[in-house]
Amino acid sequence: MSDKPVHVVIVAAGSGSRFGSDIPKQFVPLCGRPVVFYPIEAFRTAMPDAEITLVISPSMEELWRDLCAKHGFTSPRIVYGGATRWESVRNALGAYPGHDTVYIHDGARPLVTPDLIKRLGAALSDGRADGALPTVALTDSIRLLHDGKPSTAVDRSRYKAIQTPQVFDGHKLEQAYRLPYSPAFTDDASVMEAAGHDNIILVEGDSRNIKITHGGDIALAAYHIDNAAK
């Protein structure tokens, strides 16, 4: 075991093309402050000693520094992202290796709570699991698509939607990210599973922990923030 604190990687290097803004969604205002400020603060509250790495596009660094100066916000250390989320996470792990525990979180999920962060860490604390993921139940009906054939209904109770943060044994995660990229890597857990580290615990997530994807999501996130403040 190392004596390094927990490593938190917040991935905020995406372009957010579906959001329809001049700047990536993780930097747009949410209740007057950039979206990505919120998860950084949640991790600082939950784990004051954690080392936080923010992964951003090089083209956004000037904007980020300006936003921090404007709001009096202390920036975590910065790593430049790659062309894909997988590359961005790999860059962060490569820049700051050797941690026993690593959290990976989407910078566009502003409503993560310290409680969820702590519950995920507790699920991993006994050292037996490779990782832990927050999940929420599906509420819509879902159908399975077949090439050239009609779609079929499936039992949604057998499926879960996966959120972030995802937390892992840091040494196993670093090993997994040495694998060559595969289109099957839909999240960090899928990278771990490809490396044979498949003892992944599912933890009850939070339906409010939405990912900002479209313009209307900002209004929904603001609603949740306003309600939490009452």
Annotate each language-model stretch with its function.
Residues 45-48, 69-75, 127-128:
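Short helix-capping segments at alpha-helix termini
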Residues 49-53, 75-76, 130-131, 178, ...:
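Short active-site oxyanion
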Residues 2, 160-230:
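Conserved alpha/beta core of the MobA/IspD/sugar-nucleotide pyrophosphorylase nucleotidyltransferase superfamily
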Residues 152-162:
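A recurrent flexible, glycine/aromatic-enriched loop bordering the glycosyltransferase active site
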Residues 10, 36, 92, 105-106, ...:
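Residue-level signal for inorganic ion chemistry
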Residues 19, 64-68, 120, 142, ...:
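Hydrophobic packing residues within well-ordered alpha-helices of enzyme cores
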